A protein has these predicted regions:
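Jelly-roll (double-stranded beta-helix
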Residues: 1-413
Length: 413
């Protein structure tokens, strides 16, 4: 109804100390890191989504439009008569606790835990809470945009389908009076190079009656993801569970991949089914929306819903001791049977995987909710190597190979 340029000049606002827009002064570490859930603000500390953002790690800077930032959020207040415009990058919001009602210039989106939302750079929006508190994760990319991964040999069907991404229906607010403070002007918070600025305008920023185009916020219900998996043997790379990606100019690498580990059947035979111990060139920030991750036990002292972990490039990691021993005990029975099993319906873990090495924010590295004993989850790992059984397996494999060679020779003759 009125153009967004109709506002007073921006002036610097107080930027929370735990919100970062560049990471040159953050620290790097090859150690495995884990955090318990981000503490929620107390009732006497009203905190909205913007001021509840808590930067965990990142690479590059918003100023260079290069890299990314990983944040968590915990808030207990809706954004009333205000909005956020993020000039720094595109946001992927992953609610873990508490549904969000997101107002934008394009309309409304209901985003409960189990769904995710992408907010493009430069769109004005406000986050309202549908419960007393809310908590979750945010991936902010300074370069590129989220897109569906190239499915390659998978073909047309699988993973996240384009038809399941939902855009808001046009909705508008025709008012020139604040709901919370009649007579006051609306507040526009502008995030620019990691700093917050503020301007006032005499009308609601959500006064767009209709829109068209392909640059808009959207949400996705993670239960609609169609997982692919190994159906014979071995353990596929987690990239096979990619929902969205922000590719780099270098083929095979990404500014960030958003990967989920949803309920699914695990059927591989003669295989250690959980993610095995490994090192890789990517950096992995993991979160847990609900349930239990198959390679880490949940509960106090474990990987809790709302918690997070970080494993950097070439740092070894894998199942904790309890998960490892449980899988060894599950192995093929004495009769050779190796039945499938289904991961619980209430599980939903995810990963932000990135090619750029993350630097950890000082406040996150020294946080009281950081699990400094994380490394102890691998204490007690022991060898199950059986020399005699291994020798028999090698001999049996050699015999099978000799038999196949003999058949080929007969056919050739």
């Amino acid at each position: 109804m009125r153009p967004s340029v109709t506002h007073e000049p921006f002036s610097p606002s107080v930027t929370p100390e735990h919100l970062l827009g560049e990471f040159s002064r953050a620290s790097v570490t090859p150690n495995q890191l884990r955090w318990r859930p981000l503490p929620k603000p107390s009732a006497d500390q009203p905190t909205d989504f913007v001021h509840g953002l808590y930067s965990m790690c990142g690479a590059g800077s918003a100023a260079d439009k290069s890299g990314y930032a990983v944040h968590m959020y915990a808030c207990n207040q809706s954004m009333e008569d205000s909005c956020l415009c993020n000039a720094d990058g595109e946001l992927l919001v992953v609610p873990q606790e508490g549904a969000l009602r997101v107002k934008s210039e394009f309309g409304l989106l209901h985003v409960p835990p189990g769904s995710v939302m992408v907010m493009p750079r430069g769109v004005r929006f406000a986050v309202e809470l549908e419960s007393e508190t809310a908590r979750g994760y945010v991936l902010e990319v300074y370069s590129g945009r989220f897109e569906l991964p190239n499915l390659g040999p998978i073909g047309a069907n699988g993973l996240a389908a384009e038809r399941d991404f939902e855009a808001p229906v046009a909705w508008y607010e025709e008012t020139e009076e604040c709901h919370s403070a009649p007579g006051q002007s609306f507040r526009v918070v502008h995030k620019f190079e990691g700093m917050l600025f503020e301007a006032r305008q005499p009308f609601s920023p959500f006064n767009v009656v209709a829109w068209h185009g392909n640059y808009y916020p959207y949400r996705y219900d993670l239960s609609k993801f169609c997982p692919m998996n190994a159906v014979g043997f071995d353990h596929p790379d987690p990239s096979i569970f990619t929902v969205l990606t922000v590719p780099t100019e270098r083929p095979g690498t990404a500014v960030a991949d958003f990967v989920i580990f949803p309920p699914r059947w695990s059927v591989s035979e003669a295989t250690f089914r959980p993610p095995y111990y490994h090192r890789n060139c990517m950096n992995e920030f993991m979160g847990l929306i609900r349930g239990e991750y198959e390679a880490k036990k949940a509960g106090r002292g474990g990987f809790e819903p709302g918690g997070a972990s970080l494993h950097t490039c070439m740092t070894p990691h894998g199942p904790d001791t309890t998960s490892f021993e449980a899988e060894v005990a599950r192995g093929p029975g004495g009769d050779g049977s190796d039945p499938p099993h289904k991961l619980p319906l209430n599980t939903m873990a995810f990963m932000f995987e990135t090619y750029a090495t993350p630097r950890v924010a000082a406040h996150a590295a020294g946080a009281a909710h950081r699990d400094v004993d994380y490394y102890k989850c691998w204490t007690g790992l022991r060898s199950h190597f059986d020399r005699e059984a291994a020798a028999k397996a090698v001999a049996a494999a050699a015999a099978r190979d000799d038999g196949r060679k003999g058949k080929r020779q007969k056919v050739t003759a």
